[in-house]
């Protein structure tokens, strides 16, 4: 009897930093695949951390770059209607950008596009905003700066 193996693998979001001058104040928000599990993970579970380390090591280990993994979270969740949903790192990036969080400028075109000048609590709030289906900008939750509204006649 033939067996079926799904090609769909659970995804996760990871956040890490590199403690050097070039990356000062910046966090990388990326996405990886978890090879095990059903997709429902608690944030920072050992399985998520392992998958994140495997992914990050792919592009840091050979260069001898040390990093600090700060946070991991599975991308599958139940939405407000109880339906299974998923999100990706690009959606988190969009919330951050539209909320006024700046990307890290490394001085080269198309380099470091997933690095943001932010802190971990802000990234976590952006993830929640994506899960709740809130459209950016999410204002005061992300940035303490309040823009003036100009009404047109």
Where are these regions (language model features)?
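Non-catalytic accessory segments flanking enzymatic or RNA/DNA-binding domains
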Residues: 1-153
